[in-house]
Amino acid sequence: GEKEIEKYLQKAETLLNTEDIQRDGYYAFVCEKCAPVFGYYGYFLTEQDLKQRARNIYERA
């Protein structure tokens, strides 16, 4: 149900925000693909943040 989805979204956000993971092209790809899911469930700020992270990484490459 809805509570379970919220739990998974929070877990995903926590993992994506982990400081010691490498911010590379793979991370950018994951952010880009996950962002719309957060938006679909109303986490619009997280969606925008993930899209921006991906853009920043792609611009550096």
Task: Please state what every model-predicted region is.
Residues 1-61:
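Intrinsic-disorder-linked linear interaction elements in eukaryotic regulatory proteins
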